Amino acid sequence: MKGLSLEKYVDNPVWTILVETVHKMILYPHHKAYIQREILNKHPDISFQDVALNLEISRGEALVILYELKKEKTE
């Protein structure tokens, strides 16, 4: 997640709404698992913009997923 402070998005007042919306998406758990298993192993510094482009998902979903995976990794 190269040079990108994902935390700056978390401070936005609509962050919780974005997270709630992404979690309601049917393919969210599958996208998250795929990103963790396939994409981050090969490209650990990929940006959420590149994830969104490569998987043809919304930037919001990519942002939430990368933030959650980064957070899980540090815990």
Task: Name each model-derived stretch.
Residues 1-75:
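Long, charge-rich, low-complexity intrinsically disordered regions
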